[in-house]
Each structure stands twice: as structure tokens, then as C-alpha cells.
Design a protein with these regions (language model features):
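Divalent metal-binding segments
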Residues: 1-188, 194-199, 225-258, 262-275, ...
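His/Asp/Glu-enriched, well-ordered alpha-helical/loop segment
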Residues: 257-266, 274-276, 281-297, 308-311, ...
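Generic beta-strand/beta-sheet core signal
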Residues: 88, 164-165, 195-197, 213-219, ...
């Protein structure tokens, strides 16, 4: 092979396939350098949208545009006054909506946490409600076409298996069923493993899925970009606070115990250290209640772990689907992270080498659509981490993107 090397197909161990498929087929504004540029992109998108009444754009970030803020409702109104539009933030945890969409949803979102009428920005539960509405406006035929296009795109980047977290607001969780059917329809060897995002174990059991979890309903906190990742110590900027922990320990532990006793594999979203600790406590409690040797439960993201939590993950064999693409991320730069949490905590982010040294199984995922599925980028970020104390070898990074990914869903012997 000369200077080339043959490797197994890569695995993306955490993505939102329905969302990525939709946004991949729509307007992506991640590369815009100003809100003025985003507005122009939206204007052109509207002009080419034909008879569509509801539009979606993705990738807005206040940290990669010269204005240093998100595009506003009023700015969207100027270029899209007659159609509903939702511009989703780069982290997938917030959005900005125009007045036409706000008028449609005001009765549902005005009293929810995260509602900001003046700017049109929706966070937390207000965002979830907007997402539910948009999701149910999608054509099923278009969704299937977009999924196939998204799979083809990922295959072109060497990805042969994805773990998709599903359950983003379709009535009756129909998207979970759609993704399961779509996965079975693939005839080229491509593999899809579906994680239903629910704290109701019956959602998985009734669909004969062996796993449960992800983000949305299984997210224990928010994210750094929206200032709602749950922190043990307060943020250091003027906004302060310690983020948002969506559930108390009792609810999370109860869910984990039920899912574990049902024989399901569990994964939960935890970005901040407070959420990470909660996830560790809950999984530990579940396994103490009903020990299982080969459960392969996991905590997604693990951006700001604690020593105590890492010890639990090591001792209880809890695996970690991480996103090395978050390292030195244009949409969420270190300068911003340091401004909200200080230098010491910023330097503790994404300690992949520490995870490896503790014998924890670490795999890589894109969290698409938050980042584009590209395993070469994952390897590059993990190996060439600017924080060299947490950089890993090429061989370690390659294993994270291949064997470990298959291990996560019990596929390592087959794939």
C-alpha cells in the first residue's frame, strides 16, 4: 500500500441522525463571519424555498461572528417576514425564531424556561417546544430522502456505522420507528444503532431495542455555549450562576435502575461537572442495585469530569462516547470558555488521555449536526491537542474511532 494504510470503517458513536439529515439538506450558516452575512444567506434561502411554509437553518454562533452575538428576531424578520423560520444555534441547544413563528408558538413557549421574546432566542424547555413543532412539520418522504443523503455523505468520509440518538419531538416518537426501519432498509453493509432519547424504558422495550438514552429527555444539563451546563462551582462571568441541572438525583437514579433491571444499555448527556457527577452517581446506584458484568452503560460528552466521577467510571466499567471535535472548536473557542469558567477549569476540559490511563473505553462521535462527521478531524484533534498533557497517540485515537466504537454497542466481534 506504500504510504497508505488500510483501516476498519470508522464509527460515529453519537449523532442526531434525523436532525443532521434535515440540516445537511438545508441551510448551514456555520462558516458565516457576521450576522449580516447570515441574514443574506437566509434571504437567498427564502427566495429559493418555493412553497415551503417553515424553514430551518443551523449553525449560528455568537463566538464566530464579528458582532459577538446571535442574529436577532428583528434581523430575521427583515429577510424572512412571511415564512416561519428557526435558526438553530451551533450547539443544538438553542435557537432564534422570527416573529411569524413566535406568533404561532407564543402560547406554548411564553411561560417556559428559556423564553426570550425580545431577541427571539429560545433556550431550555422553550427550545425543546420549538424543536417539537418544527420536527412535526417535516415531510416523512423528505426525511427519508435526507437520511439517505446524510448516510452517503458519511460513508464518503469512511464512516460505516453510526449510533444515533432519536426522539426529538415527533408525535408518538415516530422518528425512532422511522430510523429503525431506515436502518433495516440499508443493503450495503452500513450499520445504524438507534438509542431512543427517553426516560421511559417502555419506549425502548416496545420497539425491541436493547439500549436507551442520549440527549434531549436524557440530557442531564445544557451546554457551555448556552451557559447552562451544570457546574459544581459558579461561572465566573457577569451572568454567573451554576447552569441548569434538569433533574434531581431521585429521578435520574430511578430511571437508571429501571433501565438497568430491564437489561437495557444506558447513555446520558453530561457536559458540566455537576451533571457528570450526577450521571456517575445514578449509574453506580443502578449497578449496585442490580449488578451486571457487561452492561456497557455510557456517559456522553464528559467535557468537565471530576476525579471522583472518573474513579466510578473506571471501577464500574462505564464507557465514554466523547467529542474530540470540540477541542479548539471555532464555534466555541477557548477564549470564550475561559471567560465563563476561568483558566483552570478550561484546561481540564476533554481529558482524553486521563480517561485512557484509567482504563476507560473511550470512543469518538461527532454530535452531528453540532460538528460535521469527519473521523480524520477527530483523530487530528485528539492527537494534536493544544493541551499536550491530554494528547493521545495516533494508535490510541485510531482505536477510539474504530474498535472502541464497535465495542460500545457490542459489535466488536462482528464488525
Amino acid at each position: 500500500l506504500g504510504k497508505k494504510v488500510l483501516v476498519p470503517a470508522f464509527v460515529d458513536t453519537h449523532q442526531h441522525m434525523a436532525s443532521f439529515s434535515t440540516f445537511h439538506a438545508g441551510l448551514n450558516v456555520m462558516d458565516a463571519e457576521s450576522n449580516e452575512e447570515i441574514a443574506q444567506m437566509v434571504k437567498e434561502f427564502v427566495q429559493s424555498s418555493g412553497n415551503k411554509k417553515t424553514l430551518i437553518a443551523f449553525g449560528a454562533s455568537p463566538y464566530s461572528v464579528k458582532e459577538g452575538r446571535l442574529i436577532s428576531r428583528k434581523e430575521l424578520d427583515k429577510v424572512c417576514p412571511d415564512k416561519e423560520i428557526m435558526v438553530v444555534k451551533y450547539d443544538g441547544h438553542a435557537c432564534i425564531i422570527n416573529s411569524r413563528l413566535l406568533d404561532k408558538l407564543k402560547g406554548k413557549v411564553s411561560k417556559l424556561r428559556g423564553y426570550h421574546e425580545d431577541t427571539g432566542e429560545m433556550n431550555q424547555e422553550a427550545f425543546f417546544e420549538c424543536s417539537n413543532y418544527i420536527t412535526n412539520s417535516l415531510s416523512i418522504i423528505d426525511l427519508f430522502k435526507n437520511m439517505q443523503s446524510a448516510i452517503d455523505f458519511q460513508a464518503s468520509h469512511g464512516i460505516g456505522c453510526i449510533h444515533t440518538v432519536s426522539g426529538v419531538g415527533f408525535t408518538g416518537n415516530l422518528d425512532i420507528t422511522f430510523e429503525k426501519i431506515f436502518a433495516k432498509s440499508l443493503t450495503n453493509g452500513y450499520q445504524v444503532r438507534v438509542f431512543p432519547q427517553s426516560m421511559n424504558v417502555d419506549v425502548a422495550l416496545k420497539r425491541k431495542l436493547p439500549r436507551i438514552g442520549g440527549c434531549f429527555e436524557c440530557a442531564l444539563d445544557g451546554c457551555f455555549g448556552s451557559h447552562d451546563a451544570a457546574m459544581n462551582e459558579p461561572y465566573v462571568d457577569s451572568l454567573g450562576g451554576d447552569g441548569v441541572l434538569y433533574y434531581d438525583d431521585e429521578k435520574v437514579i430511578d430511571f437508571c435502575k429501571k433501565a438497568n433491571r430491564a437489561g437495557l444499555q444506558i447513555e446520558m448527556h453530561a457536559i458540566g461537572d455537576k451533571a457528570f457527577d450526577q450521571a456517575c452517581r445514578a449509574l453506580k446506584a443502578a449497578l449496585d442495585d442490580y449488578p451486571r458484568k457487561d452492561h456497557r452503560h455510557g456517559i456522553i460528552h464528559d467535557c468537565l469530569p471530576t476525579e471522583e466521577g472518573i474513579k466510578i467510571c473506571r471501577d464500574y466499567n462505564i464507557q465514554m462516547p466523547v467529542q474530540s471535535a470540540f477541542i479548539n472548536w471555532k464555534q466555541e473557542p477557548d477564549e470564550y470558555l475561559e471567560s465563563i469558567m476561568g483558566k483552570e477549569r478550561t484546561e481540564r476540559l476533554n481529558p482524553i488521555r486521563t480517561f485512557n490511563e484509567n482504563g476507560i473505553v473511550v470512543s469518538c462521535g461527532s454530535d452531528a449536526p453540532c460538528t460535521s462527521p469527519d473521523p480524520i478531524v477527530w483523530i487530528d484533534k485528539a492527537v494534536n491537542n493544544m493541551n499536550q498533557s491530554q494528547a493521545v497517540s495516533v494508535q490510541e485515537a485510531l482505536r477510539m474511532c474504530t474498535y472502541n466504537g464497535y465495542y460500545v454497542t457490542f459489535d466488536e466481534k462482528e464488525r
